[in-house]
Amino acid sequence: MELSRCRVELGTCPQHSKRFLKALTKEKLLEAKHSGPRLCIDLSMTQHMSKKELSRLAGQIRRLYGSNRKASRPFWICLTGFSTASPLYEECLRMNDGFSAYLLDVTEEDCFSVFPLETLVYLTPDSEHPLEDIDQSTVYVIGGLVDESIQKKVTFQKARDYSVKTARLPIQEYMIRRQNEKNYHSEILAINQVFDILSTYFETRNWPEALKKGVSPGKGYILQNSAE
């Protein structure tokens, strides 16, 4: 298949069709599996979630995967702590067309067993360390939680238990709190929002642009140089 040649002249390639674009997307995803970077969604904390929470998480997984497929530089995604007999898996099948054919890894094992601990960086808003860059040899871990089920420092403590490095998105470094009626400010984001930030930064190397992509106005933050 002459995907590489056609990619150079994508606008004029005679194979520029849905079938070709699907094959090109598959090629990019498989390249990411071998060259990185890798993103792990830790789904080992879903056993106490309600049906509503599981549905929200399944929807976030769908949006995350969809964004990754469209990315010019995709990540390779691994869903860990994820049993095919779990209610979340059933919800993913119900809500997400073609879920069983998603190009990603699925394992029941915990992320701390799947990957060498020294390669992991667990992303948690409770970390003291801002994420400065994305390293293609690193596995970035996002806790598979939703807003309604979040308990403070759960993911941070889990990473500490395994002596794994942690980092937080650099919201405090590039954004400021915006006054609002409810005085509400939160750095807790949905997993697809976290991914949108990581993906945008990986493509642009621009944190303000990336944060603007994933931190919605409802979180109570705006970029430092934004007009009030």
Model-found features: residue ranges?
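RNA substrate-binding interface of SAM-dependent RNA methyltransferases
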Residues: 1-129, 181
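Intrinsically disordered, low-complexity regulatory regions enriched in Ser/Pro/Gly/Thr
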Residues: 31-34, 69-71, 113-116, 132-135, ...
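Eukaryotic short linear interaction motifs
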Residues: 48-50, 85-87, 129-132, 148-151, ...
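Broad hydrophobic/π-residue packing in well-ordered secondary structure
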Residues: 61, 120-121, 126-131, 139-140, ...
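C-terminal folded domains that constitute the principal catalytic or ligand-binding module
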Residues: 137-228
